[in-house]
Regions:
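Ribonuclease/tRNase effector modules and their secretory precursors
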Residues: 1-386
Length: 386
């Protein structure tokens, strides 16, 4: 049995639960603070982590309070005048050594929580927020520790560049990462297949406000923060293509699955995103192929709402075999993957879409379509740039 004086010492030096504060001079609306408090409390009290396989499973809140208290204060179990505790101490030491990898996983779980918390509030066109987790001494308690979560903010400022003899508003592109801050995007022109003496010098990336609006209109079924985060990730690891007019296209991926392309130019020493093309738009390889197969042109796609992701989050479209065959044949299988992976978490779906109406609109009839379209396999190839 642990002596009372040691239990008292543990209590005074315990690790406290998570506390959320606004950092420094950051400006954070109360609704965001309250949302962070409620959401983080719920997540940390419900997400589990395995400490000892088959024996000990705790919540993240318990891990960062009870388990951390024991780990940090292990030395207080080692007084010379308590030899009876030696077997217990040996077990604790082994337990503490085994905690290293578990701490890494617990910290990664918290980082992911802090990232997702900002998805509902981050907007590259307005303000970016990030949360930082620190273990700080508790005031007034000897070696007491508090799990402090500070909310930081950065208000976005726009500038302008001259495009086609007109001044266009642009925003420097970056994203706020938990425990870090703003990570700005820069790309070497050589990555865009540009060949000159300066091609290996990274250039800052900017996005026209027009392009940001197109992204929101066309990827219209997820929180803005998650849409912008995936833009950031796509540009940090750019996959570059050229269209038939030699325009540079950078693939946009939503959590790893293609959903469209950014058309970019190099202007005034900056890489500038001019617009965003949804994967079915006519300016994309898939959009051109879809038009060739179905005869659908830009206004047809707009009429049928095929120019936005929310349409493809409806079960009427995602589960229609004929539509799936057409999408597969046009290399638009990525939309089926997005449906399968993300439909349940979509915040907006097209409630009025009628897949049969679309098939009638394009005159779909298996008797008149090539065999390859009638029984198209699920393709996994990169788009062919034409």
């Amino acid at each position: 049995m642990i002596p009372q004086k040691i239990l008292d010492k543990l209590y005074s030096t315990r690790t406290h639960s998570f506390k959320i504060v606004v950092a420094g001079e950051s400006s954070v609306p109360s609704r965001i603070i309250n949302d962070a408090i409620l959401t983080l409390s719920y997540l940390t009290k419900n997400q589990k982590i395995v400490v000892i396989p088959g024996k000990l499973v705790v919540t993240l809140d318990e891990f960062f309070t009870v388990i951390l208290t024991v780990s940090v204060n292990l030395n207080i179990f080692l007084p010379d005048d308590l030899p009876a505790l030696k077997p217990f101490i040996r077990k604790l030491k082994k337990f503490n050594i085994a905690l290293d990898n578990i701490f890494d996983k617990a910290n990664e779980d918290i980082r992911k929580m802090l990232l997702s918390l900002a998805f509902s509030h981050n907007d590259i066109g307005k303000t970016l927020y990030w949360l930082k987790h620190q273990l700080n001494p508790t005031p007034g308690l000897e070696r007491g520790i508090v799990n402090l979560i500070s909310i930081n903010s950065y208000k976005i400022e726009s500038s302008s560049i001259v495009v086609d003899d007109n001044h266009r508003p642009v925003i420097r592109l970056g994203y706020a990462l938990p425990n870090y801050g703003i990570d700005w995007v820069a790309i070497k022109p050589s990555v865009l297949k540009v060949d000159n003496s300066f091609a290996d010098i990274p250039l800052d990336v900017y996005i026209q406000t027009h392009a940001l609006q197109r992204l929101s209109e066309r990827i219209d079924c997820f929180p803005t923060g998650s849409i912008h985060y995936n833009m950031f990730i796509s540009l940090k690891d750019p996959r570059v293509f050229y269209d038939g007019n030699q325009n540079i296209l950078i693939e946009y991926r939503y959590f790893g699955t293609r959903a469209g392309y950014f058309r970019v130019d190099i202007i005034e020493g900056k890489i500038v995103i001019r617009t965003f093309l949804f994967v079915t738009n006519n300016g994309t390889p898939e959009g051109i192929k879809l038009g060739n197969i179905t005869g659908l042109q830009r206004l047809d796609k707009k009429y049928l709402a095929l120019d936005r992701l929310s349409t493809f989050m409806t079960s009427d479209l995602g589960e229609n075999e004929n539509v799936r065959n057409i999408l597969n044949s046009a290399d638009c299988h990525c939309l089926l993957e997005l449906y399968e992976r993300c439909q349940k978490v979509a915040t907006n779906t097209s409630k009025h879409f009628d897949a049969d109406l679309m098939l009638k609109y394009i005159g779909y009839d298996k008797k008149y379509l090539p065999e390859s379209i009638q029984h198209a396999p699920l393709l996994r190839t990169q788009p062919e740039i034409i």
